Amino acid sequence: MPRKPTPEEIETAMLALVTERGAGKNLDPTEVARVVGGDKPDEWGPLMGLVRQVAVRLMKQGRIVILRKGRPADPDDFRGIYRLTLPPSPEA
C-alpha cells in the first residue's frame, strides 16, 4: 500500500502544476492527486478531499484561485466540479 502524501507534498505539486500551466490557464484538481498519488483511481481518488483542503487554504492565502463554472469560487462554500488557476497578476 503506498504511503499517503502530506499536505505539504500536495501543496508543492499544486503550485508547481498551476505555475507550469501559466496565467489564464486552469488545472483539474485530479491532476494534482494523480501526481502525488499515482495513476490508478483507487490511488488518487482518496486524496481528493485533501487536495480540496489544500486548494482552499492556498486560495485564502491568495496563492491560487478556485474556479467554479469559470468564475472565482467562495473558498468556504463551493460544490461540484472546480478548477485551479493562478491569481491575476497585480499589473492586470
Predicted regions and their residues:
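Long, charged, low-complexity intrinsically disordered regions
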Residues: 3-7, 88-90
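Positively charged, polyanion-binding regions of nucleic-acid-associated proteins
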Residues: 5-26
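An alpha-helix initiation/capping motif
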Residues: 8, 30, 49-52
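Short acidic, hydrophobic short linear motifs in intrinsically disordered regions
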Residues: 24-35
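Short, positively charged loop/turn segments that connect secondary-structure elements
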Residues: 37-53
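Basic amphipathic alpha-helical segments that dock to polyanions
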Residues: 57-58
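A short, conserved structural fragment
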Residues: 62-68
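Short, cationic-aromatic polyanion-contact patches
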Residues: 69-92
